Each structure stands twice: as structure tokens, then as C-alpha cells.
Amino acid sequence: MGTCRESEPTQIFVPGPIIVGAGPSGLAVAACLSNRGVPSVILERTDCLASLWQKRTYDRLKLHLPKHFCELPLMPFPKNFPKYPSKQLFISYVESYAARFNIKPVFNQTVEKAEFDDASGLWNVKTQDGVYTSTWLVVATGENAEPVFPNIPGLKKFTGPVVHTSAYKSGSAFANRKVLVVGCGNSGMEVSLDLCRYNALPHMVVRNSVHVLPRDFFGLSTFGIAMTLLKWFPLKLVDKFLLLLANSTLGNTDLLGLRRPKTGPIELKNVTGKTPVLDVGAISLIRSGQIKVTQAVKEITRNGAKFLNGKEIEFDSIILATGYKSNVPDWLKENSFFTKEGMPKTPFPNGWKGEKGLYTVGFTRRGLSGTAYDAVKIAEDITDQWMKFNGPLSCRNICSSHIIHLHFNKS
């Protein structure tokens, strides 16, 4: 008797690039390619666009920078949007962006492995449903693909709720509770501020030095002021000006337990990727005592935490505002372009292109403006190659979501 053999995974040939990730970065590349007539396919592990924004951000979140610094290529924000759009408005902008350029990602496709095949000269991207194959691979999973959970001694002993900010929505779930907030970046500051709205008692852990700047100065964006000054003055001089501005509006934050780094805010961002905190009200609550600043945690106990200064405090809940990391090393089988942490080895502005048709977007540590820059560069480069392979007519005859399915069965 004959036996039925298991069929090979479905082979899906993509005439244009495969883009992994349907966040703003992946959509920006797809839009720029579509505008040039080059097809692409986006593989997205979740069931929606911009899943970080839709599923892993808190309700009160707004863009930290003015909207004109956060626009995706080819489509500005609506004029009636406020200077700092809310999370909900940004999501609506992203959805409108995808609709305008007819971008239709393949959802619920978790990339298990992507590797280059030297024999065929193609990238093979394996998901649970098949293997996508293309000449080009664009990594658009970004710097914030996975939450970072710190290794704090005793954390598993704690009997109360422990929540990463990726799962935090609002302070309503922590009303009237004493909460330990681990982390003092923009998320840690904003979560602490939000907790105060619900009469919670946040204690924010500050382990390292941190730059805090006012978000605005006399109605002008601090970031906008910095970008304008950098066109005319050296970086170190602009950093000195920003610190003078911060001290004049926020006071000496060292006195609040927020030590400033010796390196200036912009230089530190460029070198390490550490973003300065843009204050939206937390500093005044720290000064009034509504938000407590604490030293680094020595260990977590069943009911609270012991600190390096010897103090021990009981807490009802712990919120981990400890950021995110790249997940590229988990699935991309390539070790010459990315570091072991999953970041491009080549710094901005040249970190968008690797070898053998590999590209990366959303890893600039320069927010959405860096994403837009990379997306345009990638689309230009791929279009040049596409034209050589296919000619100008092909660019207009294939829609952006076109893919060819090839089924191979064992004999």
C-alpha cells in the first residue's frame, strides 16, 4: 500500500522585498516602494498595524516630539491634529497611511527564521504558514520589539502584582496603592505621573544619572530649538544651552535625586541611544513629594523592597518601566551586520543597508524622523535594482501586495 507523505511547507515567492514588521517603520518602507511602483510584502506577527502602539502602550501616551518631527514619508499629519498627538490619534494616522498606499500586511505571521541562501542568491523567511522567498529582506521589527525584564534579586518572591509598562494601561488599577516604579526614563516618569492621578503613591527607582529637559520652552519645542541650533552651532555648545534652559525652568534636578550625566543630552543620545526625559509634569510632583525618588534596589522581598541605602519599604505593586530591546537575534541568521544585541553595527546615517539585499529600518535611535530617513534611502536603493531586473514598465504593472504562491509536494 502507498503512504501519504507530509507535504513541504508552502513556498511563496515575493517579486519585491519582504518586510518584517508592520509598525511605522515597515509601513514607511512599503509606502515609499509603492510610490515608486515596487511591490512588497509585510509579514506581521500580530493581528494589527503598529502593535506596539495599539497593544503595549499606556492610555495617556502622546508623542513626545511635535508632530512634524514624527511624520512618515509622503503623508503629513492632518492639520487639525494637536502639536503632540495622542496615542489614539497616532494610531488613526498610521491606519490612514496604510490605506492611502494600499498596504495590506500578512497578519499573524511570526517569523521563525530568516536566512540567505548562497546557492539561489535569495532570502528565505520561514513563518508557521510557509517560506517566503525574495531577493531583498527589510528588517523593520525595530528597537522596541520585546520588553526588557530586569534581573532583580527576589523579584519572584513578591506576592503582589508585577507589571511591565508594556501591559500597563492606566493608574486606575493601582488606585490608593503604594507602587514601586523601576525605571526613570520617559515611561517611568509618565507612569508615575499617571499613578498620582489615581491617588497612588509611586516610588520611582533611579539607578543611574538621567537628563531631564522641559518638553517646551515658552511655547516652543525644546527638541525643535535643539534641531535649529544644531544647523548653526557645534553639538557641545547646543548641549550647554539645553542644560542652561533646563536649569532655568526645572531647577537643579540633582537636588531631587536625579543626577545629570557628565555628557550632554544630545551627545549622550547619539553615542548610547539613551533618550533624555522630556518633562510633562513629573518634576513638579517630585518636588512636591507626591512622587518619591529612591535609590537602586538591592533586593525585592515578599512585601516590598530593600534599597542600597539600607532602607526597606513595603509596596502593594511593582511596575517595571525598564524599556524594550530588539528581537533580531532570535530569528535572523546573520552575524556580520547586526550586533549580538540586535542593533546595526554601522551607526546612523549609514546603518540602513547590509549585504546581499539586507536592509534595516527603525534602528537609528532617532525616532520616527530617523525611520523616515532610512525608509526613503531603502526605497531608492531597492528601486534602482528593481529597474535593472524588471525595467520601468514592470514597476507600474504589479500592485504593492502581489505575491505568487508555489506549492511543492514530495513525490
Swiss-Prot record:
GO terms for molecular function: indole-3-pyruvate monooxygenase activity; indolepyruvate decarboxylase activity. It comes from Arabidopsis thaliana. FAD binds at residues 21-26. NADP(+) binds at residues 183-188. It is an enzyme of class 1 (oxidoreductase). The gene is YUC4. Pfam families: Pyr_redox_3. This is Probable indole-3-pyruvate monooxygenase YUCCA4. SUPFAM superfamilies: FAD/NAD(P)-binding domain.
